[in-house]
Amino acid sequence: FGSLLGLCLITQILTGLFLAMHYTADTSSAFSSVAHICRDVNYGWLMRNIHANGASFFFICIFLHIGRGMYYGSYMFKETWNIGVILLFLVMATAFVGYVLP
């Protein structure tokens, strides 16, 4: 699942950059910029859907990756496991700041 995580991360970064090129964060025009992305940008609706569903798939892959590590006893490698826990917290914090707060 590590390679799927890398593929999801690259997809999220690329679609996020392309969506950010057309998005306006101003409160009066944010909704119209999303409508502009979906209607006027070539394959904008597809980029938006890939970005939204890719985030869910990314977290599913993370949890499957952690579950596989727990099943095979990888938690015995303390340093590696602790780095993974720190990365999990960073990913959750990034998702909170990027998706929940706005």
From Swiss-Prot:
Main localization (coarse): mitochondrion
Which cellular compartments is it found in? Mitochondrion inner membrane
Q: Does the keyword Electron transport apply?
A: yes
Q: Which Pfam families match?
A: Cytochrome_B
A GO BP term here is: mitochondrial electron transport, ubiquinol to cytochrome c
Source domain of life is Eukaryota
Chain segments annotated as transmembrane: 1-21, 45-66, 81-101
Provide the cofactor list for this protein.
Answer: heme b
Q: List the GO terms this entry assigns under cellular component, sorted alphabetically.
A: mitochondrial inner membrane
Membrane topology per the entry is: Multi-pass membrane protein
KW Iron (keyword) present? yes
Q: How does it assemble?
A: The cytochrome bc1 complex contains 3 respiratory subunits (MT-CYB, CYC1 and UQCRFS1), 2 core proteins (UQCRC1 and UQCRC2) and probably 6 low-molecular weight proteins.
Annotated function:
Component of the ubiquinol-cytochrome c reductase complex (complex III or cytochrome b-c1 complex) that is part of the mitochondrial respiratory chain. The b-c1 complex mediates electron transfer from ubiquinol to cytochrome c. Contributes to the generation of a proton gradient across the mitochondrial membrane that is then used for ATP synthesis.
- Which family is this sequence assigned to? Belongs to the cytochrome b family.
Specify the protein name: Cytochrome b
